[in-house]
UniProtKB/Swiss-Prot annotation:
Keyword flag Magnesium: yes
Name used for this protein in its record: Xylose isomerase
Top-level lineage group: Bacteria
Active site: H101, D104
Length: 439
């Protein structure tokens, strides 16, 4: 293993009185809640890209991180060093899972054949690392957005040769994900959108993207991949408008191409807020549509209009997130992947741990609070009472199709219907939720 984290020991749970900044105060992996351990409920993962590929640069300035695996040198040697550092970090942090893009773990090289060869070599390395550490792969994916060839999209590119190049990456990344025991495969369409309608054929691009998704599903079944295929919605950035805008938009897209029973969503908190939604809204929408798959845990800055990918730190926000997840039965193949990165001036090795520890403690405390809400589920009782009329004779006949518009109008007139207003009691329910969060 690398020496980069040599002065950091494995992170332990030390309880709420802990003064050690490199310790968990709330995340006790084996603590039982609602019949499962915290580890089983939360299924934490750390990502390769933000932690080991981003050099700390931004559009206004150069890299700030002094990472040995990001220095100039033989690209494959740097990839091996990066893998050493990554698995050392994952192991010391104590997450059970990790996630990667294909080009996170291996250099692209100068040709498609070189990419395939480099990637295959590094998959061998990751397989060995998993055997040595016991770490598992939550999901893999292909980076079909960073290389300049994808400046006008991958699946939606006007050039079918670019489409074919992206398909080759996806083919290899899916095979690697299956080989490494990955529980999901993610599709994020970072460039699947447009900058201007002046040069865009919307129908053509939707057909292309739909066909790519169909090919992915066909290949999943051909190779016998047992994991879940996930789409990660995002409204914009890097493109002006992306076709996977939000969960509801994704559902409409999947229905159009007959994929609504084949693909679920990987919801990111910051993407939800960029789309004008709350994190809770996107999860509730996904569970109501049968699309809930996995989570990219992070947060945005409400004063900024872009994807800041900060670590989650709001127990209040994430209690409601955990409540929706628990109410829906919890994760199956998904989990909480920290698609989060330290700030550009946070240059020390310890900073990577501080960010994840804070995020893991936040989600653990949110889980605890949400479990209390489930055990004393006042919200569900209020909702059931509010919609009780739909379980009575009139409501049942409307939904079953026993009433047409004409017969329902006749019934209303004959019965002299006079609905009585009832309070939504929002403020009361908000106070109840606060009682659980701040007890």
């Amino acid at each position: 293993m690398t020496e980069f984290f040599k002065n950091i020991n494995k992170i332990q749970f030390e309880g709420t009185d802990a003064i050690n900044p490199l310790a968990f105060r709330h995340y006790d992996a084996e603590r039982m809640i609602l019949g499962k351990s915290m580890k089983e409920h939360l299924r934490f993962a750390a990502c390769y890209w933000h932690n080991f590929c981003w050099p700390g640069s931004d559009v206004f300035g150069a890299a700030t991180f002094d990472r040995p695996w990001l220095q100039s040198g033989n690209a494959m040697e740097m990839a091996h060093m990066k893998a050493d550092a990554a698995f050392d970090f994952f192991s010391k942090l104590g997450v059970p899972y990790y996630c990667f893009h294909d080009t996170d773990i291996a250099p692209e090289g100068t040709s498609l054949k070189e990419y395939v060869n480099n990637f295959a070599q590094m998959v061998d390395v990751l397989e060995q690392k998993q055997d040595e550490t016991g770490l598992k792969l939550l999901w893999g994916t292909a980076n079909a957005f960073s290389n300049p060839r994808y400046m006008s999209g991958a699946g939606t590119n006007p050039d079918p040769k670019v489409f074919a190049y992206a398909a080759t990456q996806i083919f290899n990344a899916m095979g690697a994900t299956q080989r490494l025991g990955g529980e999901n495969y993610v599709l994020w369409g970072g460039r699947e959108g447009y900058e201007t309608l002046l040069n865009t054929d919307l129908r053509q691009e939707r057909e292309q993207l739909g066909r790519l998704m169909q090919m992915v599903v066909e290949h999943k079944h051909k190779i016998g991949f047992k994991g879940t295929i996930l789409i990660e919605p995002k409204p914009q950035e890097p493109t002006k408008h992306q076709y996977d805008y939000d969960t509801a938009t994704v559902y409409g897209f999947l229905k159009q191409f007959g994929l609504e029973n084949e693909i679920k969503v990987n919801i990111e908190a910051n993407h939800a807020t960029l789309a004008g939604h709350s994190f809770q809204h996107e999860i509730a929408t996904a569970t109501s549509l049968g699309l809930f798959g996995s989570i990219d845990a992070n947060r945005g800055d409400p004063q900024l209009g872009w994807d800041t990918d900060q670590f989650p730190n709001s127990v209040e926000e994430n209690t409601l997130v955990m409540y929706e997840i628990l109410k829906a039965g919890g994760f199956t193949t998904g989990g909480f992947n920290f698609d989060s990165h330290v700030r550009r001036p946070s240059i020390d090795a310890e900073d990577l741990f501080y960010g994840h520890i804070g995020g893991m403690d936040t989600m653990a405390l949110a889980l605890e609070r949400a479990a209390n809400m489930i055990e004393n589920d006042v919200l569900s009782k209020n909702i059931a009472q509010r919609y009780a009329g739909w379980n009575e004779d009139l409501g049942k006949k409307i939904l079953s199709g026993d009433h047409s518009l004409e017969t329902l109008a006749k019934f209303a007139l004959d019965s002299n219907i006079a609905p009585v207003k009832e309070s939504g009691r929002q403020e009361h329910l908000e106070n109840i939720v606060n009682g659980f969060i701040y007890k």
